[in-house]
Swiss-Prot record:
Keywords: Ribonucleoprotein, Ribosomal protein, RNA-binding, rRNA-binding, tRNA-binding. GO terms for biological process: translation. It comes from Ruegeria pomeroyi (strain ATCC 700808 / DSM 15171 / DSS-3) (Silicibacter pomeroyi). Binds 23S rRNA and is also seen to make contacts with the A and possibly P site tRNAs. Pfam families: Ribosomal_L16. The keyword Ribosomal protein applies. Belongs to the universal ribosomal protein uL16 family. This is Large ribosomal subunit protein uL16. SUPFAM superfamilies: Ribosomal protein L16p/L10e. Signal peptide: none annotated. GO terms for cellular component: cytosolic large ribosomal subunit. Part of the 50S ribosomal subunit.
Length: 137
């Protein structure tokens, strides 16, 4: 699964996800892409599950680009532990996704396979998405 090799700080504030994606809202690599329509935290496990669903449907043909990276540590305290006594330890890594962000791109397969692969990937994610197609061909 994806996670940073090293970070400046071990733990991070929760924060909020405001506004639309400034960058990463256009297709840069592939012909088909999966674009987020709402703000949400996407975990490294969800990204990996979506990637596996896509590559499995494409039968190892074509190419998949993952345009998001889980760089936010999410902490949690163990079960049945009282409040206080500091912040919990890092449980998993997540990526804050804003609306308009292209998360995955596909190329090298036909239209039907690409759309179905992206639909299967979208099922694994906790947000509403839309399949986008490059128009300048």
């Amino acid at each position: 699964m994806l996670q940073p090799k090293r970070t400046k700080f071990r733990k991070m504030f929760k924060g909020r996800i405001h506004g639309l994606a400034k960058g990463g809202s256009d297709l840069n690599f592939g012909t088909y892409g999966l674009k987020a329509l709402e703000p949400e935290r996407v975990t490294a496990r969800q990204i990996e599950a979506a990637r596996r669903a896509m590559t499995r449907h494409m039968k190892r043909q074509g190419r998949v680009w993952i345009r998001i990276f889980p760089d936010t540590p999410v902490t949690s305290k163990p079960t049945e532990v009282r409040m206080g006594k500091g912040k919990g330890s890092v449980d998993y890594w997540a990526c804050k996704v804003k609306p308009g962000r292209v998360m995955f791109e596909i190329d090298g397969v036909n239209d039907e396979i690409a759309r179905e692969a992206l639909r299967l990937a979208a099922m694994k994610l906790p947000i509403k998405t839309r399949v986008v197609v490059r128009e300048d061909w």
